[in-house]
Amino acid sequence: MSVAVLHSRALAGVAAPRVAVEVHLSGGLPGVHIVGLPEAEVREARDRVRAAMQNAQFEFPARKVTVNLAPADLRKESGRFDLPIALGILAATGQIPANELPRYEFAGELALTGELRAVRGALAMALAARRDGHAFVLPAASAGEAALVRDAEVYAAPSLLAVCAHLAGRARLALPAPSSSATCRATTDLSDVRGQAHAKRALEIAAAGGHSLLFTGPPGTGKSMLAQRLPSLLPPLDEDEALEAAAVASIAGRFVPEHWRERPYRAPHHTASAVALVGGGSDPRPGEISLAHHGVLFLDELPEWDRRVLEVLREPLESGVIHISRAARQSQFPAQFQLVAAMNPCACGWLGHASGRCHCTPDRIARYRSRISGPLLDRIDLTVEVPSLSAEALAAPALTATRRVRDSEGGVALAEKPATLSAESSAAVRARVTVARSRARERQGKPNARLQPAEIVAYCRLDGAGESMLAQAMARLWLSARSYHRALKVARTIADLAGNVNIAVPHVAEAIGYRRFDRL
């Protein structure tokens, strides 16, 4: 037999298209020729494969070896094709039986000693192999994450010799156990935050509906603390969501088996580039928005971000996916993240503070806020002020109910005074959030923030008084059609938290109150 055909997987976004690895031996000058649009690391496989076979005591053929990776128009990258290429050469030379090869798919990078090294995207490849009904042989270091896929037949291979022994029937490869005992960490709790009842209420609404949220306030008022506690308010990921998020992390090479059931939380620095935020590169990799899939993306110091970087968020905030186009290829990554952002009210940060330390002129304040475009702000569902706390509130035991102290001129919140109610834990708020999300899922099969225009008409109906109030707000605040729909979705979430089937006037009024930037 001078021809052998095996199968492996490439990566294209989060998809893992099947690749046929065809090996042909012929006369001519000895050497290995790899065709089928291989990248540099794939072309280098000929040297790794030769050394690995020889060190594993196999004979490398003194003939011309042609390796074709099909389909030819799909780029192949990384060392994942080392193992199938080596097995194809061994099968074509009759050193291993070929009758079992069609049942399996193979992926793995070979060390020069014949040991197998981990590969990226094992979880995505295992999902695709299960869908096509094939068993998958992977390096032992990657098989654990692939075994998380329910009903997938995955084998953990430590070396080329072990794979050959398995195919010859002399020894069986191990079936790795999935990491099903992973539990969610509870490292932060909402009760850690003193006061800020209004901001906590907005955080609960955002968690219940999957809404985007913007905190604005002076430095040190707890904006970042509140954002960090949003994941603790969200219900646990179901298995499908966890696998989707884990597959993205696996493709990026950041998969951690112990935490695969946790909600992702990403907080990139404001100096991050557009490629770091949304993904890209010559070999497209997922960015921060995809690594936050089914989780939380926190952008601190929002006006300090490059405006061009922020503008790329507009598409994924609406669609939940990001399309990356390059001259040679196109990739698509999921990006159903929940955006939480924070900013100061002005360039110096002290506008509205009780100390009166702000000396920014109106023009300077306007220039600072204009760093964030109107279309991006229009896509943020809730905007809430996080005012400074008094020393009394900070020194008191954890308190959540507060009353606002306002100045006599503009009604700007300057500080908060503590009341007497105990602070709620994340678990208590999460229980209400879970119930509200269950109501939304039973009604429409998705969170309220993901409702499309036709679904808003069906599920966010208002009575006459509610329609009148929203119409007045639209006229007075110059709300766009998008803002109108987002206010409706927030009102639907508030009604779900209250346990109401219908949206009432108080729900609409509260939702309008969170359109703060529409009033500036």
Segments (PLM) and residue ranges:
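Conserved alpha-helical scaffold flanking the Walker A/P-loop in AAA+ ATPase domains
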Residues: 204, 259, 264, 274-297, ...
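Basic, amphipathic alpha-helical bundle interface domains used for macromolecular binding and assembly
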Residues: 35-46, 59-61, 68-78, 284, ...
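Short beta-strand elements
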Residues: 19-25, 277, 381-384
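Residues immediately C-terminal
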Residues: 112, 297-298, 304-305, 391
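Walker B catalytic acidic pair
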Residues: 294, 300-301, 312
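Walker A/P-loop
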Residues: 215-257
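Peripheral, non-AAA+ core regions of ATP-driven protein-machinery
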Residues: 1-214, 218-221, 325, 484, ...
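The Walker A (P-loop) glycine that initiates the GxxxxGKT/S ATP-binding motif of P-loop NTPases
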Residues: 217, 279, 301
